[in-house]
Amino acid sequence: MTLIVTGAAGFIGANIVKALNERGETRIIAVDNLTRADKFKNLVDCEIDDYLDKTEFVERFARGDFGKVRAVFHEGACSDTMETDGRYMMDNNFRYSRAVLDACLAQGAQFLYASSAAIYGGSTRFVEERSVEAPLNVYGYSKFLFDQVVRRVLPNAKSQIAGFRYFNVYGPRETHKGRMASVAFHNFNQFRAEGKVKLFGEYNGYAAGEQTRDFVSVEDVAKVNLFFFDHPEKSGIFNLGTGRAQPFNDIASTVVNTLRALDNLPPLTLAQQVEQGLIEYVPFPDALRGKYQCFTQADQTKLRAAGYDAPFLTVQEGVDRYVRWLSGQV
């Protein structure tokens, strides 16, 4: 049976395609916005059956042109949290997603989709409950609104619907994201260009570089998606993060030490890195005051209750792997 991955040439989508290939799955229809032709580079080492534009795909899928479709991994979306065009965001992230969901329900296909931790906005609790969901931007709102549709549909759905609220994802195949790429990606490139990594100084009670995020490797994101793919009886909306909040200092320090290791240099403590000017703290920008999350941490209770029991990579493990991969691409 056919598998479909939307956003297949994007960051998470391409990693899911690659993970499916590693399991021997090659009957994959890759869907993306083909107006950005250069994104195909993420699929060069992948095996797929077809590569379709997102608009053509929705029309053909609704008509049943692809025969029996087992599952759709719906990763296609505008993920730019700074985007301010509400019409574009709602068309791309909400209405498009509804059309794909409707086609999956009509054809009995599994529907696994990308939600986002941006739904939580400025909340200090990160649990899949309506009471703590308060998005701060139109991107988060578009994801929030679609999750509400899913909640209404789930009780009567005859096929799987599984949504994943991604926290701060990093890893291979994100180069095309530019300014929206992960902190690890930017730290790597900054260190190679300038010989140091710059982090925000103290803010809102957090010491310099100690603002924290739940940083999750795209390797783990792909594994969770495939776990639910293997268990079509499991539906719901789930946080997808490590359950650990780690400071930006951990990312920067791991980037520095991994690059040092590749140059056969010994590791340094964070204090030594700061003392030697390898990590530098800059004043917290006024433009971000009051709009910046200093803490995110996924509540994994629901994910673990669904049966996913594999450990998640720490920042030290995942970023080390990622930096070595990036170094091999240069």
UniProtKB/Swiss-Prot annotation:
Catalytic activity: ADP-D-glycero-beta-D-manno-heptose = ADP-L-glycero-beta-D-manno-heptose
Top-level taxon of the source organism: Bacteria
Pathways per UniProt: Nucleotide-sugar biosynthesis; ADP-L-glycero-beta-D-manno-heptose biosynthesis; ADP-L-glycero-beta-D-manno-heptose from D-glycero-beta-D-manno-heptose 7-phosphate: step 4/4
Pfam families: Epimerase
GO MF entries: ADP-glyceromanno-heptose 6-epimerase activity; NADP binding
Keywords: Carbohydrate metabolism, Isomerase, NADP
Residues the entry annotates as binding substrate: N168, R179, H186, F200, G201, E202, Y203, R213, Y292
Binding positions for NADP(+) per the UniProt entry: 11-12, 32-33, 39, 54, 75-79, 92, 143, 169, 177
Top-level EC class: isomerase
Active-site positions on this chain: Y139, K177
Cofactor note: Binds 1 NADP(+) per subunit.
Function: Catalyzes the interconversion between ADP-D-glycero-beta-D-manno-heptose and ADP-L-glycero-beta-D-manno-heptose via an epimerization at carbon 6 of the heptose.
UniProt free text on domains: Contains a large N-terminal NADP-binding domain, and a smaller C-terminal substrate-binding domain.
Protein family per UniProt: Belongs to the NAD(P)-dependent epimerase/dehydratase family. HldD subfamily.
Cited NCBIfam families: heptose_epim
Name of the protein in its database record: ADP-L-glycero-D-manno-heptose-6-epimerase
Gene: hldD
